[in-house]
């Protein structure tokens, strides 16, 4: 998606081969574009934002428990459990949105794949929730389900009537992620941003600000 125009065709499949075969971030982006039937050379100099629908980090408390054997003082309810949920996820819980946990829910495999992609192709933390290759690629975490009440997202989606023809919910979520990436690049003020209290390495789930009460 560039300047609000969708260039890529819908695609749903396993990215294991592009991830394993890519030699660097430029090659990885080119392989992603190719599976979506976009000529990589046509956008060779364009900035790239990947909005990835999976947890891109584990909580600091969980990492400290595993690596250092350091426990938190107490564990209360599930939604406030710092081992299960990061600051960004607890932020959403407090606002009526229920994200999944990379630890207790069935998304751990996808989370490790997303973290693996960051480590290989966008290993530098530019700011909380923003990973980059120090070049044209930046990656952020998206959560399409959190966008359902956003009038900003609804307005953008109406510009793509083909969304109703997409065969699978994953493809519709992919379009929502692409629109989130567009907002991040062109209209970051429309997204809820992390505060100074957000742990840098835990990342941040970017959602439209008007999706939150």
Q: Locations of the language-model features?
A:
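RNase H-like (RuvC/DEDD) metal-dependent nuclease/polynucleotide-processing core
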Residues: 1-213
């Amino acid at each position: 998606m560039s300047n609000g125009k969708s260039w890529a065709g819908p695609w749903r499949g396993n990215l294991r081969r592009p991830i394993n075969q890519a030699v660097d971030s430029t090659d990885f982006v080119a392989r992603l574009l190719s599976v979506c039937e976009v000529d990589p050379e046509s956008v060779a100099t364009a900035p790239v934002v990947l909005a990835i629908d999976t947890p891109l980090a584990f909580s600091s408390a969980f990492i400290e428990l595993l690596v250092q054997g350091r426990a938190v003082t107490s564990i209360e309810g599930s939604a406030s459990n710092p081992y299960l949920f990061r600051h960004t996820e607890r932020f959403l819980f407090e606002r009526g949105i229920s994200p999944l946990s990379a630890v207790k829910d069935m998304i751990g495999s996808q989370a490790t794949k997303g973290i693996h992609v960051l480590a290989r192709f966008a290993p530098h933390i530019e700011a909380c929730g923003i990973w980059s290759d120090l070049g044209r690629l930046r990656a952020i975490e998206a959560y399409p389900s959190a966008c359902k009440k956003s009038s900003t997202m609804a307005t953008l989606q109406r510009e793509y009537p083909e969304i109703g023809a997409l065969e699978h919910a994953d493809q519709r979520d992919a379009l929502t992620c692409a629109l989130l990436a567009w907002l991040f690049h062109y209209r970051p003020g429309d997204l809820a941003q992390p505060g100074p209290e957000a742990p840098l390495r835990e990342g941040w789930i970017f959602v439209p600000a008007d999706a939150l009460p």
